[in-house]
């Protein structure tokens, strides 16, 4: 049996993955998380960036390799159709792109960050600093956090040779434009869980940081108590007096 916690722990010790991950949220979404102990897994085609999950096809494969792939993918042995298709590059590319999209649509994706103090993310994802930022200890829920990918930021699209290596398709899910580098993003992937709620361990939620404009502090604290989030510590983000940054300080109940 695979020891998921040990694998994550080894990755943390080697500096390959973070021990804690953060998730910004509006108050309404935060309440749903606390009520259900579940997180929404998005599908690849629901992201707000139109460049997200873009890729460039690497067509370095032979007619025979394409024919074998086509017959396997369509579960037929009609090699003549495959060879006729191979002569039309545009049709080949369209066929491959459809196959890639079929593969990607099965993955549920949840986005996290290693940075709980980013002004832009507080504004964008925590509704103008009125929301919260959740802090998760990944070792306290190895089942949820086992399939973890660090996002790679590039100026050019990922090159993908789907015919020779279908398994590399998942790389598309971890690449995005350099413009988003400030997000310091990590993603949890769940095969077969796109557009679904997936449960997480209450113990893994170890801190809630209230935004500097958050007015729902008491209600969120009450919900944590009512729904069994006993490990949560509370903090408050406040504007610094002399610089463009946030100061996070612990709260006492």
Walk through the language-model features, giving the residues of each.
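Partner-binding and oligomerization surfaces adjacent to conserved cores of proteins
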Residues: 1-253
């Amino acid at each position: 049996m695979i020891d998921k916690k040990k694998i994550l722990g080894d990755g943390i010790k080697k500096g390959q993955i973070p021990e804690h991950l953060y998730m910004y949220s509006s108050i309404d979404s935060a309440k749903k998380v606390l009520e259900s102990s579940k997180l929404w897994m998005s599908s690849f085609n629901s992201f707000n960036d139109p460049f997200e999950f873009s890729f460039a096809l690497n067509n370095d494969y032979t007619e025979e390799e394409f024919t074998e792939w086509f017959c396997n993918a369509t579960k037929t042995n009609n090699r003549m159709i495959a060879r006729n298709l191979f002569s039309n590059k545009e049709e080949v590319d369209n066929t491959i792109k459809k196959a890639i999209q079929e593969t990607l649509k099965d993955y549920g994706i949840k986005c996290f960050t290693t940075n709980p103090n980013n002004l832009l993310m507080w504004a964008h994802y925590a509704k103008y600093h009125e929301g919260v930022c959740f802090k998760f200890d990944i070792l306290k829920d190895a089942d949820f956090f086992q399939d973890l990918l660090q996002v790679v930021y590039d100026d050019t699209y990922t090159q993908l040779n789907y015919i020779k290596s279908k398994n590399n398709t998942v790389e598309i899910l971890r690449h995005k434009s350099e413009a988003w580098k400030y997000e310091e993003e990590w993603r949890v992937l769940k095969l077969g869980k796109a557009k679904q709620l997936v449960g997480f361990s209450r113990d893994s939620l170890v801190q809630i940081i209230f935004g500097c404009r958050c007015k729902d502090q008491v209600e969120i604290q009450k919900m944590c108590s009512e729904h069994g989030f006993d490990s949560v510590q509370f903090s408050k983000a406040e504007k610094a007096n002399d610089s463009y940054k946030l100061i996070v300080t612990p709260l006492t109940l």
